[in-house]
């Protein structure tokens, strides 16, 4: 009986040592993983559009809310800032007359909580905790007095992604920035598609 008791104690000690070793090893492996930094914004990655206008005017009419679920006031750069950078790089006036006006009416970034399942199986799952959403609403107006030409493009672009409950603060920052960049790409796609419909707006 004493022999069986000692054997059981040895087995318990061995299992405990294995558990501690695995935990320490996992911690070492985790700490060695490189940290992903939030992606930067490089407007040079977008192809320029040669606009038949003498100047580009950017009007920021978006008043960012300072309360949840809006978080843009805590970001640098802001969503509005990215739009201005994009426009300054992409919409290049090369004409001798006329004007291109970009009126930004919304450039928001929000984070909202997602409902979680409370069943037993969900306790062992990495549930999605929050949703990041970036939204852009703007109007692009072209006024060319020569030939009495003009055109308007309505921009309505958005992007979103979810963040799991196990995400680190850095993971959260990466998700927010990537969502913002996705919205800029959506906006860029819309502008390129719609400028083709306005004859004479874009020069070769």
Predicted features and spans:
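C-terminal/domain-edge helix-coil "capping" segments
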Residues: 167-204
């Amino acid at each position: 009986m004493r022999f069986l008791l000692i054997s059981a104690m040895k087995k318990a000690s061995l299992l405990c040592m294995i558990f501690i070793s695995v935990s320490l090893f996992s911690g070492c492996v985790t700490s060695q993983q490189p940290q992903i930094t939030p992606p930067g914004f490089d407007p040079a990655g977008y192809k320029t559009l040669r606009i038949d206008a003498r100047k580009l005017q950017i009007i920021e009419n978006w008043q960012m809310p300072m309360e949840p679920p809006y978080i843009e006031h805590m970001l640098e750069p802001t969503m509005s800032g990215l739009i201005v950078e994009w426009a300054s790089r992409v919409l290049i006036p090369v004409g001798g007359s006329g004007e291109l006006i970009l009126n930004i009416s919304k450039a928001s970034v929000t984070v909202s909580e997602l409902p979680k399942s409370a069943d037993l199986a969900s306790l062992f799952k990495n549930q999605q905790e929050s949703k990041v959403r970036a939204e852009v609403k703007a109007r692009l107006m072209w006024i060319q007095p020569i030939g009495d030409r003009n055109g308007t493009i309505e921009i309505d672009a958005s992007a979103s992604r979810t963040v799991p409950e196990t995400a680190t603060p850095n993971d959260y920052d990466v998700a927010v920035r990537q969502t913002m960049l996705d919205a800029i790409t959506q906006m860029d796609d819309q502008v390129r598609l719609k400028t083709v419909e306005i004859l004479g707006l874009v020069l070769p």
